[in-house]
Amino acid sequence: MKKAIQFGAGNIGRGFIGAVLEKAGYHVVFADVNEQIVDRINRDKGYTVQIMDTVCEEVRITDISAVDSRNPELAQQIAEAEIVTTAVGLTILPRIAGAIATGIEARREQGVEQPLNVIACENGVRATSQLKAAVLTHLDAAGQTYCEQYVGFPDCSVDRIVPPVKSENPIDVVVERFFEWNVERAAFKGAVPEIPGMNPADNLIAYIERKLFTLNTGHAITAYLGRMKGYMTICQSISDEQIHAVVKAAMRESGRGLVARYGFDRDAHFAYIDKIIGRFTNPYLCDDVTRVGREPLRKLSAGDRLVKPVLTARQYGIGTPNLLLGIGAALHYDNPEDPQSVEMIAMTARLGAAAAVAEIAELPAGDPLPALAAQAYAEVERIIR
């Protein structure tokens, strides 16, 4: 029996990665700290993925079990697995690194020479590399040597909208039909597993940045502009003509940067942008703007979805007025229930928009972006409200 360990039994874990692995013939063990979800998976031994699109479909996922990720039993589960995946959020990766390291150590002690591949399926660049660095800190020299020989850590790019829709059954999940899972081919240990829906990629960074600069950029700007106008959901926000125009223009600006850097076909990429915007309008996937816009400090960092597209585009002399409006809107994201929003609003009030952006994105002195962002911060308030 092929076995996969999926850290994170949340909506993404169940509705995307876990479902893909189960359909590929793996017994999927969900590892999570949510005891209610763990108990429900073990009780029901299955859940339904509701694919909501112009044509709706229900898919049953049944070859599954679950374990509390703090349970020592997890180490043996990892010792018996061929693949470990995560969908827990970037900030949680260091917290699960110890459990993964313990599982790797169990494999070493048991003399397991079958390769294990660990893939962090998170919204971030090189998430698996970050996880690997954290895992290695929990291994001694012998464990690190074993890990380098038998454990692969391929980076990946994932794309599927899985909104937090409440169902009668708490482990059923709603998803869109579209998904992409691009995984770094060269980083696998052993043969690349044949998993329908997983694309082994030779130029992963291009796929990572295409997704980051398109879906993530557009999603975030839609959320921040929608919040400024009082909308509650992404589909409401993108249906506003003014927001739609800014978001599409911003995605085209980031797209021109991608075309210049990676040689994507311009027309094909612009068609991809239109497809992404079409996904935002899906009435079955009315994602909350507060969920999509959460953690604005992270989203405003130099390597993330708002600032990095601007930095990339300017390398090729491409103007980014609408991307800058997105940064300005992010600085207006005022959500008292989001600690990063509270910190950002206080920082902007204390330092001013330009200095706040410079500090958040850790930009060098003299970089022109903070001043441009400050202008956009004022302009977006004038034109959007």
Show which residues each predicted segment covers.
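Substrate/ligand-engaging "lid" and interaction regions
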Residues: M1-I5, N11-R385
